A protein has these predicted regions:
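Metal-dependent nuclease catalytic cores that hydrolyze phosphodiester bonds in DNA/RNA
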Residues: 1-72
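Polar low-complexity intrinsically disordered regions
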Residues: 2, 108, 122, 181-182
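Mg2+/Mn2+-dependent nuclease catalytic core
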Residues: 62-169
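Glycine- and charge-rich intrinsically disordered segments
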Residues: 172-182
Length: 182
């Protein structure tokens, strides 16, 4: 039993390492740098998808901080879409199965919404967001899931609830929180 669980932990570690390497290769590509050998099979399909979708990446690996709500994170990209909406894009490596679509995990739209608010100050009427899923089991397979302003607004509300719960459980108060004082 111990041997099997060690193997499972190794698989998780290997998957995380591959995801990190794919992210690094994508970052290199979009900065105009050399893509590490062996990663073109992941990078090229993503580049083609982004071009086909009319997405223009404006900033890469951007650290975002929301001091009033008390959270921070690093987004993969800030972008403009084909109709001029600004948004947040995050790459996700994922094991996929042939014929089954990539669907966001529950927290992924919340992450995009939180980054939108940290970057732009709110979920504006022209906000957009997307996750680009890169298959680690079907080389060359990439899919995009886009989020509308309505979806981002709902995800932001969910994120705020989760953040409030986390802050309560951890006894954390944002240093610049502008809420009521008791």
């Amino acid at each position: 039993m111990l041997f099997r669980s060690e193997g499972a932990f190794q698989q998780v570690s290997d998957a995380a390492d591959l995801g990190t390497a794919i992210h690094s290769a994508l970052e290199a590509h979009f900065k105009g740098e050399q893509v590490p050998e062996g990663y073109d099979a992941y990078v090229y399909p993503v580049s083609c998808l982004i071009e086909r979708e009319g997405i223009k990446l404006l900033e890469h690996e951007l650290r975002l901080v929301n001091t009033s709500d008390g959270y921070a994170g690093t987004t993969d990209a800030v972008f403009t879409d084909s109709i001029g909406f600004n948004g947040i894009l995050d790459f996700k490596s994922r094991k996929t199965k042939p014929g089954q679509p990539c669907t966001p995990w529950e927290t992924e739209p919340m992450q995009i919404a939180a980054y939108c608010v940290a970057k732009f100050g709110s979920i504006r009427s022209n906000a957009t967001g997307a996750n680009v899923y890169i298959s680690t089991t079907e080389k060359g397979r990439v899919e995009i899931v886009k989020y509308s302003t309505t979806q981002l607004d709902e995800a932001w509300n969910a994120f705020q609830a989760a953040l409030t719960l986390w802050q309560y459980l951890k006894g954390y108060k944002p240093p610049f929180h502008e809420g009521p004082t008791h």
